[in-house]
Amino acid sequence: MTAQSQNIVETPSRVRAHALGVNAPELAKYQDEPAQMRSGAVGKSGYLKLRFAKREHCSILAEMERRVPSLVQKALYWDEEIPELPCVTMISTSGCILQGDRLATDVHVEAGACAHVTTQSATKVHMMNANYASQIQNFIVEEGGYLEFMSDPLIPHRNSRFITDTTISIHPTATAIYSEVLMSGRKYHHADERFGFDVYSSRVAAQNLAGKELFVEKYVLEPKVESLDAVGVMQTFDAFGNVILLTPKEHHDRILARVPAHFDIKGGDCQRRDAST
C-alpha cells in the first residue's frame, strides 16, 4: 500500500469521496477511467482539515491538514464587524476541478469558536470525456459555535459531471450558514455551454451532534435529459443559489422577518424562503 493509499484509508471523508459516485445512479454511465491519469491518483485526491478553537480574544485556526490540489495557507482577520473571526480562503492548485478528482473537506468549529471559510474565486468544473469529479464536505459546529461557509459560484463546463455530498453536524446552541451557488455554465464562451453539463448532483444533510437527522435535501440536474429552462425550474435564470441557515429559534425568527420572498422575472431576481425550526 502506498503512503497516499494509507492516508486515504485512515481518513473517513477521503474514503467517502473516492466511493461517492461509484454507486450513484446518475453517474452509472460515467465509470470509465481517464486515459491521462486514473481517478483519485496523486494530485487528484485533495483533502483539507480545518479545526478552529476559541482563545482569550479571538478564535484561531488551531489545526490544518492539506493534500494537493487543495490548499489553505493561514487565517486572516479582515472582518471589521467581527474582528475575532478567523477568515480562511480555500485554494485549488490545479485551478479547477478535473475529471477523476476526489475532494474532501473537514471543518470543525469547537465550543464557543467562530470561523469564516470561503474560496479564492469561482470554482470551475472542467470539460470531461471520461469519469466524473466528486466532493465530500463535513462540518462540525459545537456548543455556541459559529460557522460561515460561503463559497464562490461553481461554474460547470459543458460535458462535465460533478457530485457533492455535504453533512452539517451542529449543536442546538450553535449557528451555521452554508451556501452554494450554481451557474448555468460559461454562457458567453460557446453556444453549447449554457446548461451544457451532463450531471450536477448535490446532497446536503444536517444532524445534531448525536447523529439525529434534522433534514436532508438532494437534487440531481441532467439538462441533456430534461430541460432546466422549464417553469418552476430555472426558467430564464442563469444562477441558482441555495443558502442554509441553522440557528437557535430566537435568531431564526428575527432573520426570517428581514428576508421576504421575492420574484422579479424582468429584473432576473427570484428569492424563495423556506422556514423551518
UniProtKB/Swiss-Prot annotation:
Keywords: Chaperone, Cytoplasm, Nickel insertion. It comes from the Bacteria. Its main location: cytoplasm. InterPro entries: UreD (IPR002669). It is found in: Cytoplasm. GO terms for cellular component: cytoplasm. One of its GO terms (molecular function) is nickel cation binding. The keyword Endoplasmic reticulum does not apply. Belongs to the UreD family. Required for maturation of urease via the functional incorporation of the urease nickel metallocenter. UreD, UreF and UreG form a complex that acts as a GTP-hydrolysis-dependent molecular chaperone, activating the urease apoprotein by helping to assemble the nickel containing metallocenter of UreC. The UreE protein probably delivers the nickel. HAMAP family: UreD. This is Urease accessory protein UreD. It comes from Yersinia pestis (strain Pestoides F). The lineage of its organism: Bacteria, Pseudomonadati, Pseudomonadota, Gammaproteobacteria, Enterobacterales.
